[in-house]
C-alpha cells in the first residue's frame, strides 16, 4: 500500500483544486516557508478523520476552509480526497485496487464523508483506517514536536500508540463498544424488571 494521490480544494492555502500524485518510492515535498508544506500533511490527517482543530493548527474546524485574500473570496467548503493503493488488499473490507477517501466540510458545520464515492459515516472512515494502523490516533503522520510528545507520555498512553501502529487498536475499540452495549442492555433489563414487579404488586 502507498499513497497514490491527494486532491485538495478549498483547504487552508489551497483555494483551487490541486492534485498531488505520488509514486511508490520515497517522495519529498519541498518549498520555502509559507508555501503550504505543512498544510499538505494537515490535509492528510484531516481526511483520515482528525477532529481536533488544535492538531490541525487552528482555533476551530472552520479554519481549515480557505479564508480568502485581497484578491480571492473565501471558500464555502473544504474538500480533500486521499487515494491509496490497495492491490495487496491492506484494506480487507475493500475489493477494489484503489481506495479513495473524501471528506468535505462546510462553513455551516456540516460534514460529509465518502469511501470510493459512497456516502459513509465518520465511524466508517475510522474503522477503515483502524484495520491498517493508520488511524487518526496513529502515528503514520508525525508532525513537528510529536516525537518529544511520544517520549514524554505516560506508559498507558504509549501502549495505545503502539496498539494503533500495530493495527490492533480496533479490537480494543470494539471491545469497549460491546461492553457499553452490554451495560445498556443490563440497565434496560433492570428497568423492565422493576416495571414488572410494580405491575404485579398492583394486581
Indicate where each model-derived feature is located.
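Gly/Lys-enriched N-terminal cap/neck module of very large, oligomeric protein machines
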Residues: 2-201
